Every structure is written in C-alpha cells, then in structure tokens.
Amino acid sequence: RLGYGPLGHNIVNTLGTNLTNRKKYFLEHYGNDFPFDKFLDGYRDAYYELVEDGVPAKKGLHEILKVLREKGLKIGVATSSSEEHAVSNLKREGIFDYFDSVITGNMIEHGKPEPDIYIEACRQLKVDPSKAIALEDAINGIRSAHGAGMNPVMIPDIVQDTSKVDDILFGKCESLLEFAEILQGVTLDIEAVSYTHLTL
C-alpha cells in the first residue's frame, strides 16, 4: 500500500517499543521519507478491526493472577501500549482491579529497551527491583527489565528465539499457566510481579 513491500517482518525488531522508538526504527531502516504516520494509521485500522470483538487472554492469565493474589504479591502492568488501549483491554477482560499499578508507554520518557518503564513500575509498587519479577514476551522488554535491576522471566510469543537474552534471564516458561504452576510450588524472595501484554 505504501510502496515499500511487506513490512510485517519488522514487528520482531519493534516489539515492546514505544511509538517514538518504533518511528526511529522505521526511519533508520527505510529513510527519512518513510510515511510513518500513514503506516501507523493503516496498522491501527487493521489492528482495531482484528480486535473489534475482543482479544483472547493469554493461556494462564486468570490462573497467574489468582496465584499472585493468594501469595500476597503486588501486581503491575508495564506496557508500551497507550494508557487508553491498556486499560480498555484489562477492563474488557474483567481483571483491571487485580492490578496495583498500570504503567504505559505514554507515561515515561524512554521506551523499552531502556529501563524507564520498569523503574517507574517498581517505584509505584514501592518495591526494590531486585525483589520483583518481570514477565515479558519481547526481547526489548527483557532488556528493559534487566536494566532496571529486576528478575526477567521470558514467556515467548511472537518471538520464539530468545538466544539474544538467555544470559540475562531469571527464567523462561512456555506460558503464564506454567509460571503459575511453578510459583504455586516454590517460595521466592519476591514482593511483586509486573507483566507486559496480558491480553495480547
């Protein structure tokens, strides 16, 4: 549509980043003349059409929230999405009230992979980053959480190859359900868990 051929493969490199970093990426790779605003409009139109009837929750979402509450842990969301989009998803799924904090991309200066969003999440949750786990589905998110001093756990989704960040992972699970089952059976020295896209 824009004359640049297929662009979908770029999602792997921009997953988890905010709008500013996403635009920077496309201009660096396709030149300063790249019509990012038109691209974004088309992307959003396609996305909203896709999710018009709601977005299915990730496997184990409700189970993990229940386990975290039973263990008395604080729960936060740290997503590069807009506040409007994130809150809408959480309320539609009926889980908004589980969360002690919701930090979105428009609330911080530097998006993932910079640590700002997770630093702010821990500040709002009133926990030391070393006592918090970040559940992530993106390489940029893992780097962000690690940079903030948190314990990053990868739950692969679109990006299955995690070799670039395996050395900084606290753990890796196939799904939220697997993490919930593990958490039920162990005692960890943590006070909070923050996650990125709970319903995407």
Give, region by region, the residue ranges found by the protein language model.
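Conserved H-loop
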Residues: 5, 33, 96-100, 128
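Metal-dependent phosphoesterase signature
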Residues: 5-10, 25-63, 71
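Helix-loop "lid/cap" segments that line or gate small-molecule binding pockets
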Residues: 18-33, 89, 121-122
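Substrate-recognition element of Asp-dependent hydrolases with the DxDx(T/V) motif
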Residues: 64-90, 145
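Structural recognition of alpha->loop->beta junctions
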Residues: 94-104, 164-184
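Conserved Lys-Pro-Asp/Glu-containing loop-to-beta segment of HAD-superfamily phosphomonoesterases
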Residues: 111-139
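Conserved small/polar residues in nucleotide/adenosyl-binding loops
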Residues: 196-200
